[in-house]
Amino acid sequence: MQFGLDFNLVEELVAGVDEVGRGPLCGPVVTAAVILDPARPIEGLNDSKKLTEARREALFDEIREKAVAWCIARAEVEEIDQLNILHATMLAMQRAVEGLSVTPRLALIDGNRCPQLAVPSAPVIQGDAQVPAIAAASILAKVSRDREMQALDLCYPGYGLAGHKGYPTPSHLEALRRLGPTPIHRRSFAPVRAMLEQVSIEVEVPASVLLV
């Protein structure tokens, strides 16, 4: 049985904010902000990583139905490569909070730092396992990103994106070596950058030989 967090901890107009996808080698980083309704309990809220896929899917719909407000946002691969993953994540969190249809009086951010927001905010380390609103945000972000990676698996077959969701598993690294990076791979991440540099060297060597 998967026990959820105590819904009595929910406070009015407090947004929970979380992200999914900082570690993968490809795809966007996805964030969500959720303001829960203390009068509409949701059973079983917990850190998305502690829930089964089926339970996350069910909660995804229930959260969107019962929340006072919610927003799913993102930072694209190009933004990650340009800004770095930390700043891109902060940008995506800003977008999630700014996209809420109701302005929160406080935003609780999973982790140890907060993005610049127009509302008061506070970081909560391991917040997705403590704060129901952050847990709800983690579920929205994870389900949304997982669905996208499953769709991208059809666009870029052979990489196993539907399974590992872009994380640097042995099978993903092997596919990267065999097939090379796709347009959705993060060029600023070391394994992808190393592969691009290797390809560049392999292309340049014959040219230098011809010039001798």
Curated annotation (Swiss-Prot):
The UniProt entry's GO biological process terms, in alphabetical order, are:
DNA replication, removal of RNA primer; mismatch repair
Which keywords appear in this protein's UniProt record, sorted alphabetically?
A: Cytoplasm, Endonuclease, Hydrolase, Manganese, Metal-binding, Nuclease
Q: Name it.
A: Ribonuclease HII
User: What EC designation does it have?
Assistant: 3.1.26.4
InterPro entries from the UniProt entry:
RNase_HII (IPR022898), RNase_HII/HIII (IPR001352), RNase_HII/HIII_dom (IPR024567), RNaseH-like_sf (IPR012337), RNaseH_sf (IPR036397)
Entry's Gene Ontology molecular function annotations: manganese ion binding; RNA binding; RNA-DNA hybrid ribonuclease activity
Q: What family is it from?
A: Belongs to the RNase HII family.
Q: What is its main location?
A: cytoplasm
Q: Which PROSITE patterns did the record assign? A: RNASE_H_2
Q: Which reaction does it catalyse?
A: Endonucleolytic cleavage to 5'-phosphomonoester
Q: Which cofactor does it need?
A: Mn(2+); Mg(2+)
Please name the taxonomic classification of the source.
Bacteria, Pseudomonadati, Pseudomonadota, Gammaproteobacteria, Pseudomonadales
Is Manganese found in the keyword set? yes
Q: Which PANTHER family match?
A: RIBONUCLEASE H2 SUBUNIT A, RIBONUCLEASE HII
Task: Tell me where it resides.
Answer: Cytoplasm
Q: Which GO terms describe its cellular component?
A: cytoplasm; ribonuclease H2 complex
User: Which top EC class is given?
Assistant: hydrolase
Residue ranges annotated for the RNase H type-2 domain, each copy included: 12-201
